Amino acid sequence: MTKQIIVTDSTSDLSKEYLEANNIHVIPLSLTIEGASYVDQVDITSEEFINHIENDEDVKTSQPAIGEFISAYEELGKDGSEIISIHLSSGLSGTFNTAYQASQMVDANVTVIDSKSISFGLGYQIQHLVELVKEGVSTSEIVKKLNHLRENIKLFVVIGQLNQLIKGGRISKTKGLIGNLMKIKPIGTLDDGRLELVHNARTQNSSIQYLKKEIAEFIGDHEIKSVGVAHANVIEYVDKLKKVFNEAFHVDNYDINVTTPVISAHTGQGAIGLVVLKK
């Protein structure tokens, strides 16, 4: 059977150890901080990036250059291996589209997948992909199985500070200033891969109660298989959420990491991303 190689970007929130252990090739996004450029997870960590956000510095994220994908695909596919390239939602970044364009410019056999998610929402798809490759499942069947898995994943983001939303033009400066004064915490979810703001919470506790209600509705009669929490330097918030979810859903295993800069650049310090995978 033809060898299958997995490629992704730097936004899955999976550990470096896991990615390396499973021979997953990462093409990182780029970050710009006060005009200086950095390679995500190479020149700067997620924790370091959040420190810059806390200082209210000008930060931006950008997709990898198309040449990065072309070089990777040509090198990885030169022995005839199939390449499965899975990336953060096309509704959040141009990374998927750039990867697809690159796949059409090389001789290698490349299948590019839009995860329609980010953080552990992408990470759980990668983990499932790893298992399917180990089982020898064909690439066409893998695409179908990931489409089905995606229906069992729900992602929410609780905005920490509104400054980044103001800078990104998602809300007006006036609304942002009022929201900051009232300590409003907008909550967003991904709708077909695009971030939609769906609720405004006033406190951490009220945001957690809202998430509990929404997740209960999402899982219905199913059990929770995995919970991933990516946070922007607010581990005490994560601990509160875990306590509520332990009691409500009997979850005792969590994947926790500092959130990808692609999220924290828009959500600010104090944000969390919650990803639930139901059985």
From Swiss-Prot:
Q: Which residues bind hexadecanoate?
A: 61, 93
InterPro entries under this entry? DegV (IPR003797), DegV_C (IPR043168), DegV_domain_contain (IPR050270)
Alphabetic keyword roster: Lipid-binding
The record's section on SUPFAM superfamilies has: DAK1/DegV-like
Key word Nucleotidyltransferase present in the record?
no
Record keywords: Aminoacyl-tRNA synthetase included?
Answer: no
Q: Which residues form the DegV domain?
A: 4-278
The record ties this protein, via PROSITE patterns, to: DEGV (PS51482)
What positions belong to coiled-coil segments? none
Gene Ontology MF terms in the entry: lipid binding
Q: What NCBIfam families does UniProt report for this protein, alphabetically?
A: DegV
Q: What does this protein do?
A: May bind long-chain fatty acids, such as palmitate, and may play a role in lipid transport or fatty acid metabolism.
Descriptive protein name: DegV domain-containing protein SAR1438
